[in-house]
Amino acid sequence: MNLPQIFVEQMKEILGPELPEYLESYEKPKFTGLRVNTSKISVEEFERISPFKTLRRVPWTPNGYYYTEEDAPTKHPYYYAGLYYIQEPSAMTPASVLPIEEGERVLDLCAAPGGKATELGAKLNHTGLLVANDASASRTKALLKNLEVFGLPNILVTSEMGDKLDRYFHEYFDKILIDAPCSGEGMF
């Protein structure tokens, strides 16, 4: 894999002699996953109608599955109907472990492109309020698209810095998810 040189240099500083082993990991097959939209379909019903042959459960989330590229889930009508979201399995963890109860007011501070926000919204089960925020206005287009496809009506999308949101919503939320923006290295 041809990684950006600046990234390799940064990783060399961090990893030192372990860098070659780390770089080799980029040549191994990656894990790919999808997460069922439980606001539209139950996990059991999805398993019953799923055309995908290679699905395996992601052990740390009840509605996550590994798949292989031969299944091509992004080309299936179920994807466009919002029955599932394509999400790297480790990225399923934050929203999966945050205990959300129906009727709560929840903030996803760094929400784009919407993977975690769609899970939080599904856990609210059309109750309460989810404020899906991303400081980058350009990233909210993908966020809006994903939330719309998921059919979640109780969501407010904002594009503000966290300190400004605090002025408007001070002590308002029952739960806050901050999966702070990363470098995008997971996309390599």
Model-predicted regions and their roles:
Residues M1-F188:
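S-adenosylmethionine
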